[in-house]
């Protein structure tokens, strides 16, 4: 039968891409239907119980700045928070959180159920309704037809999913869930370019059987406790838990090597390519044969379960091998395995067949988001889902789409990489993929994107009011620092010595003083005159977020301006030739991945090199430096 209501947007799938897509479309004012095979698994964390990390945390902040749910749900469910790269510059600092799976799923479901314009319905989708080159709806497994102006497909690993444990395999979308084989077959009939990829997950451990006394404890950050959402507070967090660290050893590696003949990866059973940056433990042992040990992080799955996720031992080896390798790890000699690890192969579609809006070029109104586009990770999926959902809603309403630029957002980098370069392996976001990363920081995601989100209808009044106050306060303080001047008569020698390391000899703006590497905003605001009065404070010192933003904007202003100039210079290098006999292994500043790809493709020019999948703009800069050195060296020899 035909369902009696028609929709603007149908979202197929309730994972991280699907939930953000449905919420975004509904926030944008579209009448939205989310179809899922199981309402109980909406927002399910299918693999690791964590959100964020290098590059990934940036995407989560951007989703949040655009009104998405992932960050605030993590604040409500996070049981450990850390800032990675905290000793490095703000461009590469990233938030990461361990999340209670149940609390996270509940937080996402609550937002879905309370979102105006959004309907949920539990049925697996077996078919798409296509008229000519236009999608017009979806058909469920009981033949129920739902009609809509646009459809967002977020099928994850379910399209013709095949689960492997050793040489045994069976159909599944993930452990305990059926695959979407009928939908996968229908998409093949539409002749969209596709391939197979693979991902995996480790066995799960009963924490009561672990000997923690021999393990290294890894606590979260406590001063201050990080938050993910720009609307988040540390008081939202549930009780915090530590993680623990153990290591593989020679015995572990011997066990794994002994089981490789029964590994589906190494026996040719698995054809799909796995994620380079989240390899299985057997892949690590094979690729890094000279490495004596690998870290394994024991991560709690939640507050009300003893289940532990051993991050670092993803595997599809036979269970008897999994059993031995787990028991070879220090602290896990008597560990009880609750669930076996496994690998899963699934269909994906070449993202080069997508527009930058994430709409398919071949079928109008059909959008793809998440792992179906060849990406890996909750965060990458959520970001794509938000963009696809927003653009599906805009199209259904006859409005112009939004395509984020590379200089606006990591989301822009992600989409541009996908639709222009495609993928040969599951794509993971890193800060190194962004040439504008000094501008694309976690801390300014709202300043970059919330105004855009408001214009698109994605940002509600509460977020907009909080953002407006922050934006205005930062702008006012930065302007005050630029326009307030200090001379030697006002800043006494002893105060200057304490603040700057030496007395000042002429007049400086507060902004100029703050740009000095040894001067912090806090110290500048606390500096006093001979009369004991504050020289420039208190400013916005009482608000850590505002103070950090002001200091970062002032200190990095020059670097960001120079970076913009550098990007323009790349255009002039488009036709610069690369020597045919260049030894890429000699360019040691390039990552192994980039050197490998350049050796395979052998591009003739810098422009061609820049378009090789996986070769980042940052890598092109390093290659240009190497070519300049080669040119300079050959000129010296000729002289």
From Swiss-Prot:
Cofactor(s) this protein cannot do without: FAD
GO annotation (BP), single: tRNA wobble uridine modification
SUPFAM superfamilies noted in UniProt: FAD/NAD(P)-binding domain
UniProt-recorded Gene Ontology molecular function terms: flavin adenine dinucleotide binding
Pfam families from the UniProt entry: GIDA, GIDA_C_1st, SAM_GIDA_C
Subcellular location: Cytoplasm
PROSITE patterns: GIDA_1, GIDA_2
Record InterPro entries: FAD/NAD-bd_sf (IPR036188), GIDA_C_N (IPR049312), MnmG (IPR004416), MnmG-rel (IPR002218), MnmG-rel_CS (IPR020595), MnmG_C (IPR026904), MnmG_C_subdom (IPR047001), MnmG_C_subdom_sf (IPR044920)
Gene Ontology cellular-component terms listed: cytosol
Sections of the chain in a coiled coil: none
Subunit record text: Homodimer. Heterotetramer of two MnmE and two MnmG subunits.
The family this protein is said to belong to: Belongs to the MnmG family.
NCBIfam families on file: mnmG_gidA (TIGR00136)
Function: NAD-binding protein involved in the addition of a carboxymethylaminomethyl (cmnm) group at the wobble position (U34) of certain tRNAs, forming tRNA-cmnm(5)s(2)U34.
Alphabetized PANTHER family for the sequence: GLUCOSE INHIBITED DIVISION PROTEIN A, PROTEIN MTO1 HOMOLOG, MITOCHONDRIAL
Protein name: tRNA uridine 5-carboxymethylaminomethyl modification enzyme MnmG
Originating species: Bordetella bronchiseptica (strain ATCC BAA-588 / NCTC 13252 / RB50)
């Amino acid at each position: 039968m035909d369902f009696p209501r028609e929709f603007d947007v149908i979202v197929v799938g309730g994972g991280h891409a699907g939930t953000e897509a449905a919420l975004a479309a509904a926030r944008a004012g579209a009448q939205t239907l989310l179809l899922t095979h199981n309402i109980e698994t909406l927002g399910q964390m299918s693999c690791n119980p964590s959100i964020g990390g290098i590059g990934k945390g940036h995407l989560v902040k951007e989703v949040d700045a655009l009104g998405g749910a992932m960050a605030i749900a993590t604040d409500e469910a996070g049981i450990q928070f850390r800032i990675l790269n905290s000793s490095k510059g703000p461009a590469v600092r990233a938030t990461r959180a361990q999340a209670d799976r149940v609390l996270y799923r509940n937080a996402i479901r609550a937002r879905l159920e309370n979102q105006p314009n959004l309907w949920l319905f539990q049925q697996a989708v077996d078919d798409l309704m296509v008229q000519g080159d236009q999608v017009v709806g979806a058909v469920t497994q009981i033949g129920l037809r739902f009609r809509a102006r646009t459809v967002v497909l977020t099928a994850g690993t379910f399209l013709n999913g095949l689960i492997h444990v050793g040489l045994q395999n069976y159909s599944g979308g993930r452990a305990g869930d059926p695959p979407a084989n009928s939908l996968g077959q229908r998409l093949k009939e539409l002749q969209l370019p596709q391939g197979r990829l693979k991902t995996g997950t480790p066995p799960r451990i009963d924490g009561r059987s672990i000997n923690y006394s021999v393990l290294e404890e890894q606590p979260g950050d406590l001063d201050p406790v990080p938050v993910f959402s720009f609307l988040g507070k540390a008081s939202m967090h549930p009780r915090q838990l530590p993680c623990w660290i153990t290591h593989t050893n020679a015995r572990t590696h011997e066990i794994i090597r002994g089981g490789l003949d029964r590994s589906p990866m190494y026996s040719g059973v698995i054809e799909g390519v796995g994620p380079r940056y989240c390899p299985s433990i057997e892949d690590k042992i094979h690729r890094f044969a000279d490495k004596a040990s690998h870290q394994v992080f024991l991560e709690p799955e939640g507050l009300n379960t003893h289940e532990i996720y051993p991050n670092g031992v993803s595997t599809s080896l036979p269970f008897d091998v999994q059993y031995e390798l787990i028991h070879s790890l220090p602290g896990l000699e008597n560990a009880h395995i609750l669930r076996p690890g496994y690998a899963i192969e699934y269909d994906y579609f070449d993202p080069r067949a997508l527009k930058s809006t994430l709409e398919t070029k071949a079928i109008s109104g059909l959008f793809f988001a998440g792992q179906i586009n060849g990406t890996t990770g909750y965060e990458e999926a959520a970001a794509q889902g938000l963009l696809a959902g927003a653009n599906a809603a805009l199209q259904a309403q006859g409005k112009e789409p939004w395509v984020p630029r590379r200089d606006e957002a990591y989301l822009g980098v992600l989409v541009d990489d996908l639709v222009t370069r495609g993928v040969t392996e599951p794509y993971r976001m890193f800060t190194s993929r962004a040439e504008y990363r000094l501008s694309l920081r976690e801390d300014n995601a709202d300043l970059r994107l919330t105004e855009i989100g408001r214009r698109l209808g994605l940002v509600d009044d509460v977020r907009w009011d909080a953002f407006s106050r922050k934006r205005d306060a930062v702008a006012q303080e930065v302007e005050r620092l630029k326009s307030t001047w200090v001379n030697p008569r006002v800043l006494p020698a002893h105060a200057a010595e304490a603040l700057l390391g030496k007395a000042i000899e002429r007049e400086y703006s507060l902004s100029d003083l703050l740009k000095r590497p040894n001067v912090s905003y806090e110290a500048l605001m606390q500096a006093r005159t001979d009369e004991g009065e504050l020289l420039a404070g208190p400013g916005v010192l009482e608000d850590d977020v505002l103070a950090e933003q002001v200091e970062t904007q002032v200190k990095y202003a020059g670097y960001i301006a120079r970076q913009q100039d550098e990007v323009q210079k790349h255009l002039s290098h488009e036709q610069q030739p690369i020597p045919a006999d260049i030894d890429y292994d000699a360019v040691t500043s390039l990552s192994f991945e980039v050197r490998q790809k350049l050796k395979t493709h052998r591009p003739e020019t810098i422009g061609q090199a820049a378009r090789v999948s996986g070769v980042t703009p940052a890598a092109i800069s390093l290659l240009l430096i190497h070519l300049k050195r080669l040119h300079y060296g050959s000129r010296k020899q000729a002289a």
